[in-house]
């Protein structure tokens, strides 16, 4: 069940509970892709253009562009043009702190599950 304070705030903004859940699906669905996670982590180190991302991650141009567009639409990354290049950078206001929280949670819980699975204990 969704937090009533969050729901109250969303209703004030004109969102329904269903819209909020659909927005959650879009947000978390963006994080399901391993390629998008790799792009996010690469951009946490600094801005990059498509060619730099392709080279660093070994992903083809079409996939990089498609994933960057999804990340941009969902507010995970921002783009800026410098000369003839478009550079992408992480959304420092929201995504950087969120990734730090996620990593803290993963190091406390998920890594242990992953290691147990690899050892055949899970």
Predicted features along the sequence, with ranges:
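Alpha-helical residues within the helix-turn-helix
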Residues: 55, 72-73
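Residues within the DNA-recognition helix of helix-turn-helix
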Residues: 67
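Amphipathic alpha-helical dimerization/coiled-coil segments
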Residues: 2-23, 95-122
């Amino acid at each position: 069940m969704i937090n009533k304070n969050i729901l109250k705030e969303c209703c004030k903004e004109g969102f329904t509970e269903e819209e909020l859940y659909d927005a959650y699906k879009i947000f978390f669905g963006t994080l399901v892709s391993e390629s998008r996670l790799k792009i996010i982590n690469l951009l946490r180190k600094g801005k990059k253009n498509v060619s730099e991302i392709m080279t660093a991650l070994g992903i083809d141009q079409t996939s990089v562009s498609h994933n960057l567009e999804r990340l941009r639409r969902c507010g995970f990354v921002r783009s800026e043009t410098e000369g003839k290049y478009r550079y992408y950078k992480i959304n420092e206001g929201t995504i950087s702190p969120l990734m730090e929280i996620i990593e803290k949670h993963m190091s406390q819980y998920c890594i242990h599950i992953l290691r147990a699975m690899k050892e055949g204990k899970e």
